[in-house]
Amino acid sequence: MLKVEMLSTGDEVLHGQIVDTNAAWLADFFFHQGLPLSRRNTVGDNLDDLVTILRERSQHADVLIVNGGLGPTSDDLSALAAATAKGEGLVLHEAWLKEMERYFHERGRVMAPSNRKQAELPASAEFINNPVGTACGFAVQLNRCLMFFTPGVPSEFKVMVEHEILPRLRERFSLPQLPVCLRLTTFGRSESDLAQSLDTLQLPPGVTMGYRSSMPIIELKLTGPASEQQAMEKLWLDVKRVAGQSVIFEGTEGLPAQISRELQNRQFSLTLSEQFTGGLLALQLSRAGAPLLACEVVPSQEETLAQTAHWITERRANHFAGLALAVSGFENEHLNFALATPDGTFALRVRFSTTRYSLAIRQEVCAMMALNMLRRWLNGQDIASEHGWIEVIESMTLSV
């Protein structure tokens, strides 16, 4: 099996000053191309350290993706490190220099002399185009390893990997079949509870069950070879049965996107009134393109469940909205949710049974509870659902 590794560079990445989202994206993207990473390393802006690790990994990896260090400043050392590791010099890539000059000219700017550095590549390098920036990439062969050097800007990195590097890998290597990966996301049950229920299922050969907890949700992932797809799809029915009503969506699209599509398909507009969630619902749904009308965030105030229910009923009527959703303020570990619909208004009062979670986590959980309440109504289900440490203590229905 092809041994693929990644090397992230830069002091800011090494010291945790920025999150290495490029590494997470590449690992996930390559995994779904049948190229799971076998190792990831991070090195700072030190020429000796870079040369050392390039030479070291060249003895072990078949492919190494090097990210960062292709900019115009003195701490951008990747091209020099690659040339030094190979024992050769840097040469000016005249065509890329002209392309950079054109890039700046079209934007009404004069290219700084320091940018010339970005056109200096190791003598034996294969040029890799960057259609969205000034840092071209390049590839070199060092010992057994084919190394690709890529820019650190995420948008440039992703374009280069998808459109330049992956096609080269497909040309040069015999890649395995793409793995089958089935995913669903749950809300309301703990990871240990789900695992205990699912561990009794018999997995086909080469198939693994994975769990990813990211408060307030848990993702279940069944991964295996394409040869086992039929058996996996049969097993997946059992996984969904065991997970039960905690399943909120399948795939990777996300709940806000699925709710948005359902609202559009059914021609429902939605108005929101948020207190404790502070605009999280509006943010998540607007990013997904949901048909939102007037949305408000108001200061927290103590309300009875009846007050919340009547208020959101009036708001739906006043804004001529198809649906209206409210999250009340948080008082004494209690919170109200209310959803006004053409069928009536449905309201829940919940109680938090623990105080150990941060404000941000509590807000995320409550936003998900509100979205799940909306999802369940759209699917014709009872709107009440509980979370492991949130208990529904009162419910109310107002008739149309």
From Swiss-Prot:
Pfam family, one: MoCF_biosynth
Positions in coiled-coil regions: none
InterPro entries (alphabetical): CinA (IPR050101), CinA-like_C (IPR036653), Competence-induced_CinA (IPR008135), MoaB/Mog-like_dom_sf (IPR036425), MoaB/Mog_dom (IPR001453)
NCBIfam families cross-referenced by the UniProt entry: cinA_nterm, molyb_syn, PRK03673.1
Similarity comment: family membership: Belongs to the CinA family.
Name of this protein: CinA-like protein
Lineage of source species: Bacteria, Pseudomonadati, Pseudomonadota, Gammaproteobacteria, Enterobacterales
